[in-house]
Amino acid sequence: ITSKGLVCPNCSMTTPISILRGDRVDQNSNTVSGLRQWEKSDFDFLEDDIYNERLYAIKYETKDGQRYYRAPNERDLANELNVKQIVSENIVSWQEQGLVPSMAIESGYNTDQVIRERGWTHWHHLFNARQLLLLSRFITHLTNATKYLGYGILSLNSSVDRLSRLCRWDSGSEKMQQTFYNQAFNTLMNYCSRSVASLFEQWNNSITNISNGIRGDHEIVNIDARDLSNNADFWITDPPYADAVNYHELSEFFLAWDKRLLQEAFPEWYTDSKRVLAVRGDADFSKTMIEIYSNLTNHMPDDGMQVVMFTHSDPAVWAQLALIMWKSGLRVTAAWNIATETDA
């Protein structure tokens, strides 16, 4: 596989992936994928699908930290079939119980990628049978630990980020990377999956980090910044960067798994997607940002200060931010250059 397509190992001829998928252009000049659109109860590729997948390597670690790899044997492949059979028999009831997502993927800039490139139409399609089985068992146990459900939800999110069909293999360090190593849904020609032991270790670390992470007297409030009424000497903000990252789409990946647990832990919360409330487009972005920063300015003293974390590669967006600050009654007194963590 190259950036140009699939290369034949015999003749070295390259065939674009779009040709293999059977993509076509409709009457409105939109590219339409030729892939089969998965049904709600699907969790695996069908035999006659253009794409399919198979287990082809297993990584082992010895007690002294040594690593080795081998191809799956008959027992491994039989286990895979057994897992698929279990999921096939339970997927509908799991969805009804909220143990596995039943939420459809809504069309959007980022979410269209998995629909177009794989035919996946529901969020659970981004997880294979073994991953669905493991995560459904975790949620089952979480529902019995109501006292710690809040911790469990955060740890679940960490787990689904590290246990999906979008987790790539880092050949340099010989380990798998999480789903969101950048802010996108990148479908892969080969991906990795964790074992129960590896997932438990990650889960345990998440619980420990979360329980130790917040100490002292803190208050966390989920509120529209335009409605904030507290006064403060300093406001520190990390605003969205125009349309650079579609958080309203990406967050639905987690919401699909969290829905039942959120309803049990916080019954007063609204648990559907709030995509419709996302600030999109230059006009709405500027208007909303001015309202937010004007409100913050009105709730700090004359000698107060605001620190704004803002990274963007488009100079026009920086000019837009400067106008927003000025129209909000602020003036820039200092600026620091930083290196961002991703190039997305």
Residue ranges and their predicted role:
Residues 1-233, 244-274, 278, 292, ...:
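Nucleic-acid modification enzymes, centered on SAM-dependent nucleic-acid methyltransferases
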Residues 232-235, 306:
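Generic beta-sheet signal
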Residues 238:
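Substrate-binding/specificity loop regions of serine endopeptidase catalytic domains
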